[in-house]
Every structure is written in structure tokens, then in C-alpha cells.
């Protein structure tokens, strides 16, 4: 069982950088639990405020429910209560409810509720989906606002009134006006998490809108760099932040944007570049080509 209340979990998450580890696969695309556990042990040396197991960077979309349970239980066992472990839930409402209950049974500290699969919906439908998951578990819920599941501030405020365990809002939209309206309406009722791809890009301006943390995929292969960058953001050291954006993050994004799906593929390529092979990505994702891998390795350079 989770050792934190939902409110306590949310406060902890908002206090530091968040880790979104990749999921390790063998060459035959099966889950490599030993390598996954070894990697979590390595990353445990670096202080983060939360670990999101089997999230987007962890290829949630390609994992079976049984595999998600294995990944999650491995993360809970390896962190040994030192770091809150957040589990994924998604797809349709019935499956999301099952995932949330399974995560609670596995010892997770919270749930990241991903958008429903494909279908578009009105605000009332999204609210019903989220409320059903909140009522299915005592764990704290973080709603992931993105794609086909974009809440407005009125819907979110109503959910917060009805669901005390709705404690987090992760933004994957990048709508500054919406974020301003949400924070103006709800203030510290929620913990706000930056969830755009390569979230470092938006971390400094988002800090001014109450977004005190973000999920760092780069942490997978450059943990010291990622923590240093986060520290610069929290200190509002504009010179340091924009130097690293110019010299590393923006060139990294240029590689990431070359093909669809590279937001995950480039992270595993980065791990290989620093000698921490995490195996292939699962279809429908594709690997970086040899020239792109060489370019990424050169960009990482002595930051490893």
C-alpha cells in the first residue's frame, strides 16, 4: 500500500525533478526485467522527487497490462519507498479503472491518468471518465491534459470539488492561456507538472505559471546534467538555462523532430550513447539511423 496520502504525494512530486525511465527490452522485444532493475538501481543515486513507471517514455502504449504490472512492481521493489512511484492508467474507462486498482495493489504511490484511447469527447464525458478512475482508488491521481483529453478550468475545478484524490495536473498541450486560467482558478489545490516532449524547453516560462516540476526523459542518459538544469530553472538562472537550451536541448530537439515517434527512440539511443543500452523500441516506433546516432553521440559529448 502507498505510504503517502494523495496530498503528501503531490507535494513531494512538486518539489524536484521527475524521472520517466525507459522500459528495457531484449532483442526479441520481451521485457528485460533484470536490465530494468539494474538501471533503476543506477538512477537511485540521483535525487528525484518521483518515478513514473511505464509512462510514455516507458512505452506504455506497447505494454500489456501484465507487463505494466511487472514493470510497476519492479519499480516499487527497487525504490524501496525512497521515491514515490507513479503508475500509468489509460485506454477506456473500464480498463483505466482496472489499471488503477492493480497499481494500488502493486504498491504504487499515485496514478498518471493518460488520455482515453483515440476517441474524442466533450468536457462532460472527460469528467465522467476521470471521476470513475478517481473513485476506483485511494491513490492520488494526476490527470494528463493532452491530445484528445483537454480539460478546461471549469471542468477541472468541478472535478477537484468532487474528487479529493485528484491532486495533479500534467500539461502536454502548451497552451499558455489555458495554463494561466487553470492556475488562476485552482492555485495550490493541484501540483502542476510540465509534460511536453523534452520539457526542459518550457521549464523556465512554465515556472512562472506555477509549474514547479516536469518529467525529464533526458534524465535517463544524462542524470547529472538533468538535475543541474532543473536547479538552474528553480534558481531562475536565465543565462545558465538558455546556454544549455542553445548548446544542447535545441540541437537534441532538432534530431528528435526528424521522424515521428523519435521522442522515445532518441532516449534509448541516448542511453546507448553513454554505454547504458536499453534495447530496442517496440513497433510502431522506429530506431534512429546510424548517422543520427552518431550525431547524438557527438552532441552528448562530455556531458555524460
Swiss-Prot record:
Catalysed reaction(s) here are: 5-dehydro-4-deoxy-D-glucarate + H(+) = 2,5-dioxopentanoate + CO2 + H2O
Pfam family name, one: DHDPS
GO terms of molecular function = 4-hydroxy-tetrahydrodipicolinate synthase activity; 5-dehydro-4-deoxyglucarate dehydratase activity
Coiled-coil positions are none
User: What are the BP-aspect GO terms?
Assistant: D-glucarate catabolic process
Which family is it part of? Belongs to the DapA family.
Alphabetized, the UniProt keywords read: Lyase
InterPro entries xref list: Aldolase_TIM, DapA-like, Dehydro-deoxyglucarate_dehyd
**Which class of enzymes does this protein belong to?**
lyase
PANTHER family the UniProt entry points to = 5-DEHYDRO-4-DEOXYGLUCARATE DEHYDRATASE 2-RELATED, DIHYDRODIPICOLINATE SYNTHASE
Put simply, this protein is called Probable 5-dehydro-4-deoxyglucarate dehydratase
State the species of origin.
Methylobacterium radiotolerans (strain ATCC 27329 / DSM 1819 / JCM 2831 / NBRC 15690 / NCIMB 10815 / 0-1)
EC identifiers of the protein: 4.2.1.41
Domain of life of the organism encoding this protein: Bacteria
